[in-house]
Amino acid sequence: MTDSFKRYLFIYRYSSYTKYIFGYLQIQLRVILSVGIWTFSQTNLQAAQLNENTKSSPLNTTQYDLELSKPLPYGFLIAAPENFNPDLRVPPPLPKPPENSNPPKTSTEPAKPSAVLESINTDYRYDTDNFGQTNLFIEPTLQFRLRNGNKIFVKTGYDFFEQRGVESVSNFPLQVGWEGKIGQVTLKTAAGVDVFDRLPTAINLNAKVDVPILPARVSPSGQLRSLLVVSGNLEQGPYKSNARTLENQITSWRFGPDLYWQIDRNTSLFSSLRLGNYNDGNSEVQTFSRLERKLGQFSLAANLFTWSYDRDLERTSGYFSPPDFLVYNAEVAWEGDIAKFLRCRLAANLGRQRLKGEFDNANTYQTRCTVKLSPNIEADLGYSFSNVRNQDTGESAYGGNSLTGQLRVKF
């Protein structure tokens, strides 16, 4: 070993090429050290970036979701801004660990489920009139939220239809739906079956598309100032008007647009058009418009409803099919808090209705209360009486009663 060292020392002193070789080795050593230092710094930087990317975002998600204190009429859905999908994020590549490093410890935290139960809403409706017709609807809907922000709905329940001169009909609906976003457009679709106790099973489906024309503007207090949304609707299934209509196995296709315009924070306009085709060869055109102005806890509204069928088939098919039906009225309403856990609304509609060229009074009286049972549970209970016709009663006066409710449970 000593002889070898002396030999290398001798070469260093006397060889003419030794200076160049040693200089080359010095340069190579500097390059290796520089690359090593740079690689080490980049590894720490990538690790810091990776740690930063894996942290949850501090943004409040309520900035992206608009929730109104009062739902829009007829279950109208407001398009919310696009949901952020964390699954689409691509993290930076992991640096290669040193050969002598220990393997990373696996996380003991359970993986997040692909779907989480978000809420259960149970709708209740009991309709009766002075001609012996009864319709009952009890339909719970389970809502699941997926990891990408989309929603899945499962709807089932029990419906019952009773009418004079007709055997009663029981219905067990089952429907599965999906709601998601494509850009700023909200799409909702559903399909299912209606199972009856003594009638053939029928298929049902519906679809809805919400397109925001003017984006929502919200005040610092959270009140909606302006918004314009246009919707497209498509529905198909059994026409659940009464027991006789179901016994005749009447089905319909209905489609048409909706428009909701929040003109300012106290004024809104809702308008709807429906075109319908029935399997008995009949067709319909239905329109509804409502202009509402809020005055503190009070509100004033004007309603206009038209309904016309190509043919009057009530005697053969069983459903109300007027060739020319018109209803217009004015509404006065009050809504406010009775207690911290109780909020109620009272409304009266006074107007006129026209059927087959004959005019008559058209009045409706409504009340609804919302009870907050807990932070995650609340219930609605409402009652209404109306003499707006739902069937052709000739010279006899018509009177209909509706008891409605909804139980909402959030998880």
Language-model region placement:
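N-terminal leader/targeting segments
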Residues: 3, 7-8, 30, 36, ...
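N-terminal secretory signal peptides that target proteins for export/translocation
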Residues: 1-23
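N-terminal acidic, proline/glycine-rich, low-complexity intrinsically disordered segments
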Residues: 2-5, 45-51
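Generic low-polarity alpha-helical segments
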Residues: 1, 29, 230-234
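N-terminal cationic amphipathic segment used for targeting or macromolecule association
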Residues: 16, 21, 45-46, 77
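Sec-dependent N-terminal signal peptides
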Residues: 20-35
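Transmembrane beta-barrel domains of bacterial outer-membrane proteins
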Residues: 48-331, 335-373, 380-410
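C-terminal segment of classical bacterial N-terminal signal peptides
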Residues: 37-45
